[in-house]
Structure formats: C-alpha cells, structure tokens
Amino acid sequence: MSPSLPARAVALLACPVCAAGLTEVGGALVCASGHSFDRAKQGHVTLLPPGGARHDGDSAAMVADRAAFLGAGHYAGVTEALAEAVLDAGEPETVLDLGGGTGQHLAGVLDRAPGAVGVVLDASRYAARRAARSHPRAMAVVADSWSRLPVGSASVDRVLVVFAPRNGAETARVLTPHGQLVVVTPAAAHLGELIGPLGLLSVDPDKTTRLADSLEPHLVPLSERRREDVLVLDRAAVATLVGMGPHARHLSVPELAEAVSRLPERVPVTVAVDVRTYGRR
C-alpha cells in the first residue's frame, strides 16, 4: 500500500466539484459533501472538473524524454535560478507547481526549502505518475490549469510556472496575501544553436508582452533575472531535449532522428531563461 500523502499538501487542495476542502480517507481524498477521488496505484490523484480537462497534456514519450533529460542534470541551472527566486522572499511553507510535469523542478526547490511541502498539478497522467515519486514532501495531481484550480483560496506561498501555461486569475486566487508567483520562460537565445539545423520553433518575439498581458491584470511584477548556461550535448541528449518539449508536436520521430543524425557528435547548446516574480495586487 502506498504511504500516506503529505498532510500539509493535502490541506491545500479543494474539491473540483464543490470547492470544499479535502481530507485523505483510506486510499481516497474526500470532501464534506461526499465527493471522493481515488488515489491511483502510482500515487497521484485526479482532480479534474466536471466534464474533464480541455486537453490531455504531454504524451508518455514526451514525459519519458523529460524525465531522462532533467534526471541527467542538464537543466540544473534552471532549477537553481528558480529556487533562488523562490527563496528571495524567505522560505515558503507551501509550493504549487502548475504544469509541473515530472516534478523535478519542484523537488529541487523543496531540497532547498526543508520546511516546505509541494503539489505538482499537471494535465498529463503520465507526468503525474512520475511526479508522485519525485520528493517525499510532494504530491501529484492531474488537473486542468485553465479551469478553477483544485486548490484552496489564499493557501499557497509560492506558485511555480516553468515553461508552462499561466492562469493569472487563478494564481492570484490561490496565493497567500504575501505569496509570490515565480515564472520561468525561454529567452531569445534559448536553444538557438538547434533552431536552424533541426527546424525548431523560435522563441516568440512578443512573448514578454503576452506574459505581461496575461498576468499583470491580476498580479504585480516584482523582479526579473536571466540565467544563461552553455551545455555540450551529444546527439542522444539533443534528441531527448527536443522530444520533451513543444517541438515534439511539430516533428515526427523519423524527421527528428534524421535531423539529429546530421549534427556533430557533440553540440554546444545555450540554455537561456528569464525568471520573473509577481505578487498579489
């Protein structure tokens, strides 16, 4: 039988049907109205709204590539920059990772915040299965970031969004009065060496404007910093990197394999991200 979920993490959650609080009873999360949500054998819980999610999230193959690439430590610098931004305002007690995938970025934050508990929310059940095992003080939930989040109002000290969609209104609702949102987005130079040779999508030049438009009606910008590292990757790592992200939706497996085979055996790849923090209005 799976161990109990972190009680303080469960306390953050809310029923996706009636928004009441949830408690763990046996192998399920239950609200006072009797709505019950079973815990999967892999450890995660599904808290989708009536009607389900608007999309299924990342595929099993994309999630496997992400777990392999992040597990190899290639994005350690991104996690470090994220954790620094999280801790700038003091150590949080509660952390919510929206679109958190396999939970590896959240795990890095929790390692640096020993008093905190965390919840990964992701639309992909494949990601949630891995995130459920990502850290002893974390739990994983399958949820839709574009609907009302299954999280209590004013309950979370930090919300993380790393290369994932942002729901400004719901983020503002779930943050505590002095809580902060930490957003990581790709900078213009991100993966620049691979865009031409592999036919990847370039970073949208209007990304900063779109970010402000989506968040600033609900949240106040507080800080901004950039982290840039240059990795040296072999072809297998490049294929995994491309396979884990949005580029995988635009390239078939044979197309990607052929393009990667034309690269040098080892390739310098720039990882450039902007890390921004926001507070409640």
Task: Please identify what each model-predicted range represents.
Residues A9-A11, R225-R281:
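Conserved Class I S-adenosyl-L-methionine
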Residues G21-T23, R210-R225, P246-A257:
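A SAM-dependent methyltransferase catalytic signature shared across enzymes that methylate proteins
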Residues W146-R158:
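A short acidic, Gly/Pro-enriched loop at the edge of an enzyme's catalytic core
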Residues T94-D97, G101-R148:
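Class I SAM-dependent methyltransferase SAM/SAH-binding core
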Residues M1-D56:
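N-terminal auxiliary segments of SAM/dcSAM-dependent transferases
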Residues G168-V182:
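A short glycine-rich, Lys/Arg-flanked "PGG" loop and its adjoining helix->strand segment in the class I
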Residues H55-A81:
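Class I SAM-dependent methyltransferase Rossmann-like catalytic core
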Residues Q180-R210:
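Conserved class I S-adenosyl-L-methionine
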